Amino acid sequence: MLEQMGIAAKQASYKLAQLSSREKNRVLEKIADELEAQSEIILNANAQDVADARANGLSEAMLDRLALTPARLKGIADDVRQVCNLADPVGQVIDGGVLDSGLRLERRRVPLGVIGVIYEARPNVTVDVASLCLKTGNAVILRGGKETCRTNAATVAVIQDALKSCDLPAGAVQAIDNPDRALVSEMLRMDKYIDMLIPRGGAGLHKLCREQSTIPVITGGIGVCHIYVDESAEIAEALKVIVNAKTQRPSTCNTVETLLVNKNIADSFLPALSKQMAESGVTLHADAAALAQLQAGPAKVVAVKAEEYDDEFLSLDLNVKIVSDLDDAIAHIREHGTQHSDAILTRDMRNAQRFVNEVDSSAVYVNASTRFTDGGQFGLGAEVAVSTQKLHARGPMGLEALTTYKWIGIGDYTIRA
């Protein structure tokens, strides 16, 4: 089965690479329109997936990731339209010039070819990834989690119908609908057809891909994100940022999981934090230095376990640790962070600059929420993933991250001397 999908995707990629921006936007507009026109079919399929997942004991955080609503589906369609409005990087001349030999040389952006994406209970990923791949002239093979099987099948059927209505091959966007985990291992060895692989899931999936894949892998998306509250932070303003970073949508990878509090501000900050977290329904996992003071407040508090500093809660849970100073905070982030998104709240711009320079994450913020790490927020459109590695792409992966380049030399029967 996968062999045939690979052949179809590779053939489709040749066709997609030749499309103009106008032609690619036409199919994207058609996909957006059809997602809305066929919304009832997609939502019914999703309702069945959610019901099955709930019956199987899926966590509330994962159920939130899985669930579609009419508003969320409309937002997904609108994201596709936003991709239409983005500049097409394909064909862009990055640099170039004329050599002494007279050869005119340029470096031009081109599609990667075929992208493989493995992800879990996130039905929006299906459309986000497909739209970005199509905009950049890439074919894509999707392998979603078993929890989204019906939703993905319905969504991909809509996308393929839109492709065919625009005289493009359905093989441009395909999904593996068999939940057999053995197919993941098989997919990881499809280097004959797939040019880049992007896993979007837990640490286990990333480890499997790094160890078994014969395809170049872009890893990321695991977000053990931190906020450091410096001693000069404005408490009321800091709390607004923390509430946003923790509660706006707890199941996302850019949600803060650990709060590091400078010891010199702890006595005034912790009572205010407890009050705010109680109102927000957040459970605090406190270290020994913060535990007694937080237990005196209204928030629900438990003693933090050492391993929780490495956990991506994806829920209304927040670690709280007292640190001696900025150096202590940076050391903690280096040990427990995932190089995703980390922030400092401070009025001391020297400390802010040190934090920016010394915290080696794909996105670092000063006096802002970690929730901004998102393709849409960065003006990149829907993202294919958030890369936490350093080669090829880093941070939210928009259109340019789905391209490579080729060198093109144009001469007049020019020969090398």
Curated annotation (Swiss-Prot):
Coiled coil: none annotated. It is an enzyme of class 1 (oxidoreductase). GO terms for cellular component: cytoplasm. Its EC number is 1.2.1.41. Keywords: Amino-acid biosynthesis, Cytoplasm, NADP, Oxidoreductase, Proline biosynthesis. GO terms for molecular function: glutamate-5-semialdehyde dehydrogenase activity; NADP binding. GO terms for biological process: L-proline biosynthetic process. It comes from the Bacteria. Pathway: Amino-acid biosynthesis; L-proline biosynthesis; L-glutamate 5-semialdehyde from L-glutamate: step 2/2. The keyword Isomerase does not apply. CDD domains: ALDH_F18-19_ProA-GPR (cd07079). Pfam families: Aldedh. InterPro entries: Ald_DH/histidinol_DH (IPR016161), Ald_DH_C (IPR016163), Ald_DH_N (IPR016162), Aldehyde_DH_dom (IPR015590), G-glutamylP_reductase_CS (IPR020593), Glu-5-SA_DH (IPR012134), GPR_dom (IPR000965). Belongs to the gamma-glutamyl phosphate reductase family. NCBIfam families: PRK00197.1 (NF001221), proA (TIGR00407). HAMAP family: ProA (MF_00412). This is Gamma-glutamyl phosphate reductase. It comes from Escherichia coli (strain SMS-3-5 / SECEC). The gene is proA.
